[in-house]
Amino acid sequence: MRPHVVFGNRSEARAFALAQRLPADGIFPQGIDHVLFVLGLFFLAPKWRPLLSQTTAFTIAHTTTLGLSAYGIVSLPTRVVEPLIALSIAYVAVENIWRPRLNTARIVVVFAFGLLHGLGFASSLSEVPMPRDQFFTALLAFNLGVDFGQLAVIAAAFLVVGWFRHCDWYWKGIVVPVCSVIATIGGYWTITRLFA
């Protein structure tokens, strides 16, 4: 159920609806890198505790830099942010294979990568034409849209592979191949974005 929000005028409501719809409209193909990162978090361990710890760290981080960047407090060039986002995808996927355990270091790394993804989200938000007096509404809506998108990706992953997580072959038969593909894509994007 979507949260109920009361608006003072129609233009504010339109701003909210437009900004909240943008993450969903752009999740494929423009936001596929964020989808792959969330899948990387999922495949560390498809259990609620590891997922909750990682997604909470990621959400706090990307919300922070999204807000700071949107208000012009923090800024990095897209040519720097995009390769690093791609590298974050490759990193979490490789770590899932070589060190498949939740620990403090993993949470710190996810938080750091979340800061980068927030800068990427800010770039998408900048595409929404908003009057300045409606900007906070758009920022709130966009962030809610991102969070709904993350939940949708995790729910879809559970529906597709969650049934097999207790099988003996789950790690070798699903996690390793899928994370290998994710890591390869992330590595390829890192190189192509560096030299774009």
Label the model's feature ranges:
Residues 1-32, 191, 195-196:
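Histidine-/acidic- and/or cysteine-rich, low-complexity loops and terminal segments associated
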Residues 25-196:
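Hydrophobic alpha-helical transmembrane segments in multi-pass membrane proteins
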